[in-house]
Amino acid sequence: MTLSSSQSSPPSSQNLKRKQQTISSFFTKRAPTAEKRSNDLEDGRATTQKGAEMPLRETTGDQDDLVDDEDGDIVVRAPKRVKTNRVDPENGFGRNVTRGPDPPSSSSQRTNLCKFASSPADDAGIEKADDPEARQRQLEREKLHKLFVKKLGGADCLIGIGRNATTEAPSGTEEVAEGDEDDESAPPPRSKGKGASKKGGSKLTPLEKQVIEIKRKHMDTVLVIEVGYKFRFFGEDARIAAKELSIVCIPGKMRFDEHPSEAHLDRFASASIPVHRLHVHVKRLVSAGYKVGVVRQLETAALKAVGDNRNAPFSRKLTNLYTKGTYVDDVEGLDGATPAASGGASPATGYMLCITETNAKGWGNDEKVHVGIVAVQPNTGDIIYDDFEDGFMRSEVEARLLHIAPCELVIVGELSKATEKLVQHLSGSKLNTFGDKVRVDRVAKKKTAVAESHSHVANFYAAKLKAANTADDAPASNLLQKVLNLPEQVTVCLSAMIEHLTEYGLEHIFELTKYFQHFSSRSHMLLNANTLVSLEIYQNQTDHSAKGSLFWTLDRTQTRFGQRLLRKWVGRPLLDKERLEERVNAVEELKSPDRTVQVERLKILLGRIKSDLEKNLIRIYYGKCTRPELLTVLQTLQTIAQEYVDVKTPEDSGFTSPILGEAIARVPSILEDVVKFLNKINMHAARNDDKYEFFRESEETEGISEHKCGIASVEHELEEHRSVAAGILKWPKVTYVTSSGIEYLIEVENTAAAIKRVPASWVKVSGTKKLSRFHTPEVIQLLRQRDQHKEALAAACDQAFAALLAEIATNYQSFRDSVQSLATLDCLLSLAAIASQPGYVKPEYTDQTCIHVEQGRHPMVEQLLLDSYVPNDIDLDSDRTRALLVTGPNMGGKSSYVRQIALIAIMAQIGSYVPARSAKLGMLDAVFTRMGAFDNMLAGESTFMVELSETADILKQATPRSLVILDELGRGTSTHDGVAIAQAVLDYMVRTIRSLTLFITHYQHLSNMAQSFPNHELRNVHMRFTESGSGKDEEITFLYEVGEGVAHRSYGLNVARLANLPAPLLEVARQKSSELEERIRRRRLAGLRADVGGLMEDPAKGDEDFFQRLISNAEQL
């Protein structure tokens, strides 16, 4: 073959001729003669004739060439690129070559150089074809040509490059092929004259115009767009999807603003996912922190074909929006429901928290801010609100964020710098729900925000009450009044959350005003942020997982909703003595051997609940429940209610505890409603998610019945048509067949006699070598009618199902109350399982502020240790000893001892048994801790600054009914300053605040303070140990027992030895320590000698304080 032009004569310029010669010399060893070119021409013509005899290969998946005509039939547009089978003249096998439309009359120089034909002018002087040398040279040229074509990727690839503005690129063809039959596109662009090309590439398809229109309204959203049987991403969304979902992104334009940098690109970048995997991928995108929108087609192909807009693209609309907090379309949610008992992460709360604040007063360390919060859990329907003042440390805000653990934040207005830094720190830390960055949305706050918010909330609830016809109902009016009386900052947050959730279609949750809860209710013990972390309430401090936390220790629940309720109990211990006694008495009854039968019955019942009923019910309330899920929920509720159908009153439950009796009696009250709904459902169809047979025949709506009759009528006509078809073919009878999913086909043998009888109007659908399959025009028309009825039936079934969900939603509160009763029973059974362990005792409650525990143990360490835990006593009373100064060697167990005391107090006020021989406790209103050393670089605060700031916060909030734990206060500065601060704080705690206090220190000088309290309000205790050996052979044995008195040494060198510091270093440290101790001993001895000498000179100095100081100095020697 020879490279020349077949469409136009070669240019006459000498430069172009040189270029042609240069390229020809690249492909051939020497220039061919005219005779050889003639041989090439004949071979080329032969090849072309062979190729023309080959059938065209059909393109698959390219639906851009299909459009709907006015009758709804599919017609074919002009092809963009057609693949043909060409036969290689050398080896005889076909190869795929992409052929474009006929090129324009004028071609570029580069294009002309790469076309394969001959010019009539070259016919003269042709060499004979049988010349062996010519034939050899021809084979070599063709071999080089094949290598060249293989390198470029196609025989006419340079033609495509030369006509980039008028010809679809191969990647574009692949992209369209990846789509489905509903991927509407514009006709292939025609050849454009000079200046006719549009900036930004080829003309946008109708689908792309639709995508841009929707995207411009939702620029902050990753859009997943339904296109036929796939969901597709476009532009920047495709890049994000490819990154997060590990799918292929077809290159193209990323931006939606026709940016000049992308003018050379013809199409948007795209990626696709199958329809049935939509929610799997949406969950992954939402979990990664993205806001995801699902755009669906609002019409089907069959209904569109008979509609007024059959020639327009499919109508599409944004139907769903999802973020972390609003994803309720899957009952599993985003947390994967890893049980905490297995040592996984703490269960996700799924709260969305709205926060706003105003500057109340002060500046710097005296700054006070007024904060309002509203936290909503769309998965369960819970709503928490609070209004409070907070200091410059923002400890109150931090405590609420750690308690609620939101997965999404909505910030109204501007936050102060301190609050903003705290939010940023916690939202990016592992302390949040999902262990990754929390999504943050911001809402502007107007100057008239309070008035506008109050009006918005009032109108919202007034409209809801009017729609429910309960405006004159006294309970409904009281609930409305309760909402309207919320504090101003809470109302601002509530209004913002209503508006925010309206965008996601979840505003109905605020109609459930029964589930509004105040966070700071004084009916619960206050556990601030430091306490939650230091005492490891929800997460351990090692790897931040649930294993090793108090919640992990107490969690023996069998249901998801029971686990969530127990988490609330753990974080909010009770202050009401009567409620506590009721709860702990219920636990005692459940562990009693006399109630074994009833308890086993309860355990079996709860063990049969496999679904998360609380989340299922809220999904029904939102109208997002699936048919199999609805059947499971109703059958589970029926099973639960029937288990206790004979229980009419709490006394019939078999338990004497009021909590247990009332919870069990509430369960069967829903049985009548559940059975009523189940009687409407066809169980088998619901289990198989068959929407068409979901309702029993007597419960079907008029629309469903009408379209079912229409389908039956069409199918009857199809059967009647068999006789007509048999008469045309002159057969006794005709039998329909189904092939590849296509129904009502008539098979005719491929014989001349049989085919002759087939009318020309019959459409051949498929066939084999022996037979052909046809559709008659009547069958095509009837099938089209049947498809229309089927799609209308599907819409009617969906509408009826939505109406059923709305009817069930009217019973939401009664169903939810029954599920809450089950959750309470589950939590009590969990606490009973803990109480049944050896060494646990029922706590005794008193109105006094005291902690009297005999042989108490650390609840978590005891379960994690292989060896037995050493128990210890504690005796604190506000009227006697209310503070302990704890000293002892490093690693002696001081911190574990004080944590143990706090944890026992918290467990007791949860209503749990405690690990001790006996326990008598008063009602503590809070537990405050100041433990550990860390700085706050975000706020520019040093370790010592953080330490003192937290201490100041405790001094402001602590009451005589609080338990305060201070660990090594004052160690972040010099010894003299540290001792002074520690002594002043301890004295203030004991004398002024009068809290129960546990003070850990290595400052032995503080032990002298106990002598200034004659009634033993402060007492010295230490962690016991034994010494053996001396010098470098000295060894310390920790006994982990609490003894009276003071430990005068901390034995830090022993810890250094256990840490495997180098022996030479330890020897130097021991020598320096001995020298320092000797120097201090001599100073004290000199001071003691001086005091004794002064006393002998002037006996009048010997008052009581003098002799106490003298005795203390002598003891320290």
UniProtKB/Swiss-Prot annotation:
Biased composition (Low complexity): 1-14
UniProt-listed Gene3D superfamilies: 1.10.1420.10, DNA repair protein MutS, domain I (3.40.1170.10), MutS, connector domain (3.30.420.110), P-loop containing nucleotide triphosphate hydrolases (3.40.50.300)
SUPFAM superfamilies the record matches: DNA repair protein MutS, domain I, DNA repair protein MutS, domain III, P-loop containing nucleoside triphosphate hydrolases
Molecular function GO labels: ATP binding; ATP-dependent DNA damage sensor activity; mismatched DNA binding
Key words of the record: ATP-binding, DNA damage, DNA repair, DNA-binding, Nucleotide-binding, Nucleus
InterPro entries (alphabetical): DNA_mismatch_repair_MutS-lik_N (IPR007695), DNA_mismatch_repair_MutS/MSH (IPR017261), DNA_mismatch_repair_MutS_C (IPR000432), DNA_mismatch_repair_MutS_core (IPR007696), DNA_mismatch_repair_MutS_N (IPR016151), DNA_mismatch_repair_MutS_sf (IPR036187), DNA_mmatch_repair_MutS_con_dom (IPR007860), MutS (IPR045076)
Keyword ATP-binding listed: yes
Assembly with partners or alone: Heterodimer consisting of msh2-msh3 (MutS beta). Forms a ternary complex with MutL alpha (mlh1-pms1).
Protein name: DNA mismatch repair protein msh3
Organism: Neosartorya fischeri (strain ATCC 1020 / DSM 3700 / CBS 544.65 / FGSC A1164 / JCM 1740 / NRRL 181 / WB 181)
